[in-house]
A protein has these predicted regions:
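An N-terminal, globular interaction/scaffold subdomain
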Residues: 1-13
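Generic low-polarity alpha-helical segments
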Residues: 6-7, 59, 138-139
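Accessory nucleic-acid engagement and inter-domain coupling regions
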Residues: 17
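ADP-ribose/NAD+-binding catalytic cleft of ART/PARP-like enzymes
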Residues: 20, 24-133
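ADP-ribosyltransferase catalytic core
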Residues: 121-193
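Long, low-complexity intrinsically disordered regions
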Residues: 195-197
Length: 197
């Protein structure tokens, strides 16, 4: 199997012929190949985006986050996740030291997460140490994690992030949360509170 920069030889996945890859995404691609996969484009696009991530630690940690639940991958290789925010779409917390590149903040340094908003911070404003559990950065979570943050009166959002913007997967919460430097709010699912397949 060869598609773009992704090649499978003897049940091993390579990127650009030399980088041997592993983890839940590789397992998923191999399973899809074994079952007569019809469209590998989302997975191969995801791998290409992942390999653009400047941190090898971030790449390895992202596998653990995606391994918790198979979060959906879009046709262009981005990943869908969840975010819990306040009823008025402002983040639950704010940080005066976070350098916001794109997005609206208030006087408490919270970030507005309305549908259609793209939120971006400088990558160095996002803690890359997975052992720092409650720390600075933009947080995305599994359905369960984000739904807990949304609580009964908050908003549960569907967000999309590029694997190249993943920074760290904190070791607490059973790898259910991820810190990123950028994401886009794609939908408010507060009324349905329905987890994607």
């Amino acid at each position: 199997f060869v598609e773009g920069d992704v090649e499978v030889r003897d049940e091993v996945l390579y990127y650009k012929g030399k980088h041997r890859l592993h983890g839940v995404v590789v397992d998923k691609l191999l399973d899809m190949l074994r079952s007569g996969m019809k469209d590998s484009t989302p997975i191969t696009n995801y791998i290409g985006r992942l390999m653009n991530n400047p941190s090898s630690n971030s790449v390895d940690e992202l596998y653990t986050f995606l391994g918790y639940r198979s979060l959906p991958i879009t046709p262009d290789g981005k990943v869908l996740g969840y975010k819990g925010v306040q009823e008025d779409y402002w983040s639950n917390t704010g940080n005066a030291d976070t350098i916001v590149v794109q997005g609206q903040t208030n006087d408490r340094h919270q970030i507005y997460n309305g549908v259609g908003e793209t939120i971006e911070i400088q990558r160095r404003s996002c803690d890359d140490n997975k052992d720092n559990h409650c720390s600075h950065g933009l947080h995305i979570g599994s359905y369960d994690y984000a739904n807990n943050w949304a609580s009964s009166n908050g908003k549960l959002l569907l967000v999309e992030f590029d694997p190249q913007d993943a920074v760290s997967v904190p070791t607490d919460c059973d790898f259910q949360k991820l810190r990123v430097s950028k994401y886009k709010v794609v939908a408010d699912i507060s009324d349905s509170r329905q987890e994607l397949d």
